[in-house]
Every structure is written in C-alpha cells, then in structure tokens.
Amino acid sequence: MDIDQYMTDVGRRARRASRSIARASTAAKNAALEAVARAIERDAGALKAANARDVARAKDKGLDAAFVDRLTLSDKALKTMVEGLRQVATLPDPIGEMSNLKYRPSGIQVGQMRVPLGVIGIIYESRPNVTIDAAALCLKSGNATILRGGSEALESNTALAKLIGEGLAEAGLPQDTVQVVETADRAAVGRLITMTEYVDVIVPRGGKSLIERLINEARVPMIKHLDGICHVYVDDRASVTKALTVCDNAKTHRYGTCNTMETLLVARGIAPAVLSPLGRLYREKGVELRVDADARAVLEAAGVGPLVDATDEDWRTEYLAPVLAIKIVDGIDAAIEHINEYGSHHTDAIVTEDHDRAMRFLREVDSASVMVNASTRFADGFEFGLGAEIGISNDKLHARGPVGLEGLTSLKYVVLGHGEGRQ
C-alpha cells in the first residue's frame, strides 16, 4: 500500500464530507447517532468476535493484563458505548448558535456564530471505545473525523467503522464523515499529522511517548495535554476534615488517570494535624510516600513509614501509580510558586476556609482547571456538565480543560446590516 496516496485520499474524502456534515440538521445528526447505537446492539456478536481476534493477538505478543483489559470489548463496554451515543444525541447542538449580537454606531449588528472546526484527526492507542466516543462528539459538533487507533485494535475499529458508516448512510449523511485508518503502518500517523490541506486539528489520546512524538513532528494544530502533574495544597486555614476527604479521593480514587493528584503540598502550620492521619491512610492503601525532610519529620513522629526521600525529579513526575510526593511549604506564596514551577498546567486544588486565599489561588495558579475544597478528580467533561469529552487540554490557545462539543467548534464573526457602507 502506498501510504502517502492512501492518506491523501482519506483526507480528501474527509474534507469533502466536512462540508456536508457542517450543514446537516440536528435531527439528521441525532438520527445517525441512534442508528449507530442500534447497529451496535444488533451486531454485538460480530463486534465481540472481531475484538476477540485482537485480544488473542495481544495476548500472544505478551502484552500486559492492563493493556488487554483496555482492549477488550465486554458486554458492559458495548452497553456503555450505546449509552454514550444516545447521551450525545440528547446534548444541545452548538452549531449555528449566535452570541454577543450588538448594534454599532454605523447601524450594523456584529455578533458571533459557532461553527465546526472542519476535519479532526483523532490518534489513540488500545481503547476501541474511543472510536465511538470520538466519532459521536465529532459528528454532533458538525465535524468530519479521521480516526487512527492503535494497531492492536485494528479489527475492532474496522468493525466499528462499518457500523458507523451504516448509521450515517441510514440518516442520509455521507459515510466519509467518519473514517477509520485501516492500516497499522506508523507512516499513516506521520502523514495524518502533516496534512494541513485536509486536516484542521489533531486530538491525540495516548501515552507520553505518543504525545511527545506528535509535538515534535506535527504541522497540524493539536488539542492535547502531555502530563497530568496535579497538586492539592492544604492551607493552614483549611478544615482538616475536608482536607482528609479531598486528599484521599484525589490520590486513591483511581491511580492511572491524568487528573489524579501526584504532589501534596501542606502548609507548615497545619502539617501535623493533616499529615499524621493522611500518612496512615495512604500507607494502609499501599501508597508509597516520597517526602521532603520536613514531611519526613512529621510523618515519622506519627509513626508512619516506610518513607522515601523525594528528589527534585519527583516534583516533576506523573506517576500514574500508587506513589505520592509530599512537601511542606511555608504558605500560599510558596505553594503557588511550586505549582507554577513544577506543575503541568492541568488541574490543581486548594483546601482552605479563607475566601481571599481561595480567590488568589484561583487567579494565580496557571492551570486549565483550578479548584477550591474539591478533589482534582472532578476535572472531567461529564462532571463539568459537558455531557462527554474528547480529551483534556492544558494548552492556552483554543480549548482549555475538558474538551466537549464546544471545544470542537470555533466562533466566526457575523455582521447583519441594512445596506450600510463604511464612512
């Protein structure tokens, strides 16, 4: 297969389809989502058979259990896909919304209209459910999409693509609105991320090595995040009860997510009251504690151990594991400075009863999501009321934070006049 020619053809068809889907009615888009949901319910057996072949190959390659689990399309996973499609169908359609209309002295009205981005390339790894999640959000937001999943899920994704195409056709929409790259050749990714003539934005969903490669090689703009080095700062005016709840949930609710706390900062004045019970709780749950000298002294006095001495690298590390870095700081100034120096601009939280300090933290911490008296685990499109998300961005341009339907659109200016000419 000539990869360059193949990807150029995929891009050309996506661009053509993007013009049709951009003007599609809400009813047609919702009908397509419902048709895909019914197709998955109808053909669940065939989907599971295709997925079983992917899973068997993954096991033959010796891939670990966690990878195989992400790859597997269980009955529960298929049910979640169907529910997700129907949920997206219920979301308000952002396309065509008008906002900020105002009259100018010249007599014209100036406002903004929400429009699709165009063609979105999604690059992801071993989760076939992303095929449906991404297709649904791109479709509802009026975008064409090119999906490039991991090679290990190729049969699963191809089977899902067939059902998506059937659903689009049933609703009278172009089947090229959603295309799955049907080759495992890595050169396809290289071509996709440089096709500026056909692709408007890339959304990568994967590990750090994938994101770093795309940062270095992509010519198409990206909506992405590289790391989730999230902090909780416990202020010396915090409620100890709230601090224990927030810090426990932020770390131990799930270890492998990008919105999990990786560094705990505690104000010196409240450290004994907070770290003693927290340290015992973390050790009971099997969390390794990497601590600075001050935190070590407090925790050892409380009988908490074993402890590991933290290095500078620990403050810069996204563990995605039951490991937590802990540092005692002099106060909010030092906490904000540490977060802005070592964080990844993803999600950070303060626990405090002091309103002024809370507002200062919200203003000065340079992250996509900043929280007061709440777990970092709330940084999620569903929890934020977006209905669903295609990913989380810690960039500063375009979308920032959880990216839902609106994040897959842009605003253009519209002018309404009555024959006026500029004087």
Swiss-Prot record:
What name appears for this protein in its UniProt entry? Gamma-glutamyl phosphate reductase
SUPFAM superfamilies in alphabetical order? ALDH-like
Lineage, please? Bacteria, Pseudomonadati, Pseudomonadota, Betaproteobacteria, Burkholderiales
Q: In which pathway does it act?
A: Amino-acid biosynthesis; L-proline biosynthesis; L-glutamate 5-semialdehyde from L-glutamate: step 2/2
Q: Which GO terms describe its cellular component?
A: cytoplasm
Mind listing the UniProt keywords for this protein, alphabetically?
Amino-acid biosynthesis, Cytoplasm, NADP, Oxidoreductase, Proline biosynthesis
Keyword Coiled coil appears in the UniProt entry? no
Q: What is catalysed by this protein?
A: L-glutamate 5-semialdehyde + phosphate + NADP(+) = L-glutamyl 5-phosphate + NADPH + H(+)
Q: Which GO terms describe its biological process?
A: L-proline biosynthetic process
Q: Name one Pfam family in it.
A: Aldedh
Q: Which family does it belong to?
A: Belongs to the gamma-glutamyl phosphate reductase family.
Gene Ontology molecular functions? glutamate-5-semialdehyde dehydrogenase activity; NADP binding
SS bonds (residue pairs): none
Native source organism of the sequence: Burkholderia thailandensis (strain ATCC 700388 / DSM 13276 / CCUG 48851 / CIP 106301 / E264)
- Where does this protein chiefly localize? cytoplasm
- Using the record, list the residue span of the signal peptide; answer none if the entry has no such feature: none
Q: Does the keyword Cytoplasm apply?
A: yes
The record's section on InterPro entries has: Ald_DH/histidinol_DH, Ald_DH_C, Ald_DH_N, Aldehyde_DH_dom, G-glutamylP_reductase_CS, Glu-5-SA_DH, GPR_dom
The enzyme class is oxidoreductase
Q: Which NCBIfam families match?
A: PRK00197.1, proA
